[in-house]
UniProtKB/Swiss-Prot annotation:
This is Small ribosomal subunit protein bS20. The keyword Transport does not apply. The gene is rpsT. SUPFAM superfamilies: Ribosomal protein S20 (SSF46992). It holds the Pfam family Ribosomal_S20p. GO terms for biological process: translation. PANTHER family: 30S RIBOSOMAL PROTEIN S20 (PTHR33398), SMALL RIBOSOMAL SUBUNIT PROTEIN BS20C (PTHR33398:SF1). One of its GO terms (molecular function) is small ribosomal subunit rRNA binding. Belongs to the bacterial ribosomal protein bS20 family. InterPro entries: Ribosomal_bS20 (IPR002583), Ribosomal_bS20_sf (IPR036510). Residues 1-23 are annotated as: Disordered. Keywords: Ribonucleoprotein, Ribosomal protein, RNA-binding, rRNA-binding.
Amino acid sequence: MANSPQAKKRARQNDKARAHNASLRSMVRTYLKKVVAAIEAGDAETAKAAYAVAIPVLDRVADKGIIHKNKAARHKSRLNAKIKALSA
């Protein structure tokens, strides 16, 4: 348990940041699920539209360090490959 005033404040700040980061991670997962659902449904146009919406969100979260930039790049690459395979 934090005893000093600054330790108590840091604990409060950490709780707030953790909740915010969890919210952002959840948002990213939701966008990615929409893309995957469109791909599984075989709907290329919906998948492309969902992908176009998800990519800026993914990049923004990666820039903030919520997820690693390589993980964001991996998601983008794999989803794009699946969409291209769907269109071909």
